Amino acid sequence: ASYSNASASDVSTAIDAALAAKPAWESLPFADRAAIFLKAADLIAGKYRYEIMAATMLGQGKNAWQAEIDSAAELVDFLRFNVQFAEELYAQQPQHNSPGVWNRVEYRPLEGFVYAVTPFNFTAIAGNLPGAPALMGNVVVWKPSDSAIASNWLLYNILLEAGLPKNVIQFVPGNPEEVTKVVLEHKQLAALHYTGSTAVFRKLYGAIATGVAEGRYQGYPRIVGETGGKNFHLIHSSADIENAAIQTVRGAFEYQGQKCSATSRAYIPKSVWPQFKEKLVKETSALSLGVPTDHKNFVGPVIHAGSFNKLSGVIDAAQNDSELELLVGGKHDNSTGYFIHPTIYATTNPRHKLLSTELFGPILTVHVYDDTASPAEAYADVCKLIDSTSEYGLTGSVFAADRAAVRFAEDALRNSAGNFYINCKSTGAVVGQQPFGGARASGTNDKAGGMNFMSRFVSARSIKEEFSPTTKVEYPSNEV
């Protein structure tokens, strides 16, 4: 299969077509818009379940389990729960009306169009970024990742089959910079909805800010973004060591660590390090690596040559780093695919760059903290270390049976992770259960998978109506 990249002229045409479709789409009753997305959810859950899973496996390198929980389960959850969240938002109305007065709030679609830029690593996110704004009555220009075209194109056609008018969401693959340049120059840009790298998001944020300063736009475009993470597992001496080690292996190496929430740094107390290390290395060494179509494989290839080159470069450089001890892995092979073996390093340097730099691959770095002399002080210090080591604030986990230790970490790390997990891995947020997003360099923390997220794609209008006429100009205080 092949596809064509959009030219600058194509992008302009797509924007014009979307804006032309806007009046009819936003005037359609919510129930009718919702029915389209609910039907799409049913089509994905049934008729197209295995086809969209296969497209995700073959195009994005996910094994069957990862494809199922993403392109089938989570995508369907987004489509269904977003309808519920929208209904909850619309129900937010003034609680008090004065005698003879009726107050109400209208949640209008944004004035203009939404630009959705989606990543390769989740078909569900690729559906949610254009889908959520469209559900709220917006029109969307959707630039998919060029590493996820197969699943994204299938999803787009499923939406059309479900009844989505063809111009409401414009599917516009192309060179990211060329497509974005046209979009950001358009006066009617109403919002950016983005998931991807921190560096690109910062660039887009700055470009939109420049446009605002120049008076380029008709308003102030909303910016909703979720980017990277340097997500942690903190182990307390009271933790269930087997559970903590297994959860760490899953968090670090499922889908080759190509999740913004993937576990990429772990902090282990010296008092339990021998047991933890033994289990960690044993479980990691046992992971099967190979093509996603062989269901026994836990680990598949990374997404493309650029990712392979970056990650293999990290592994090669680590061979000459005296501050790193290789515990397992450290191998890479691109002879039949872009394979990076699950790799774990231990470092004595609490500020090593591998503890602060997002790698987006199957590389975990461990720091052992000394809790033998003063356990409580060591635990407090490592919490400060975790909070200050990375610029990100996406996900993190604490493993402890001691409830005081859990409470301490929950408070000390309250700004270190937008999604904080207790005795479970740093990945796997479920729509409707754990709204997802982080702050600091990780994004705007608007929490996809919750009602507040939907509010980012509407512009509220307060309406007051009086039923009784006013009969005099003067107020009571004017009467003497």
Regions found by a protein language model. Give the residues of each.
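Hydrophobic face of alpha-helices
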Residues: 8, 12-15, 34-41, 49, ...
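Conserved C-terminal structural/oligomerization subdomain of aldehyde/semialdehyde dehydrogenase
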Residues: 1-16, 20, 26-38, 48, ...
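Rossmann-like NAD(P) dinucleotide-binding subdomain of oxidoreductase/dehydrogenase enzymes
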Residues: 57, 86-243, 296, 376, ...
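Active-site proximal loops enriched in glycine and acidic residues that flank catalytic Cys/His/Asp
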Residues: 3-7, 54, 60, 68-71, ...
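ALDH superfamily catalytic-core signature
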Residues: 158, 163, 185, 191, ...
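Conserved helix-loop functional segments at active or binding sites
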Residues: 20-27, 42-46, 50, 54, ...
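Residue-level signal for inorganic ion chemistry
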Residues: 3, 18, 33, 56, ...
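Long amphipathic alpha-helix in the N-terminal Rossmann-like dinucleotide-binding domain
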Residues: 8-19, 34-50, 61-91, 100-104
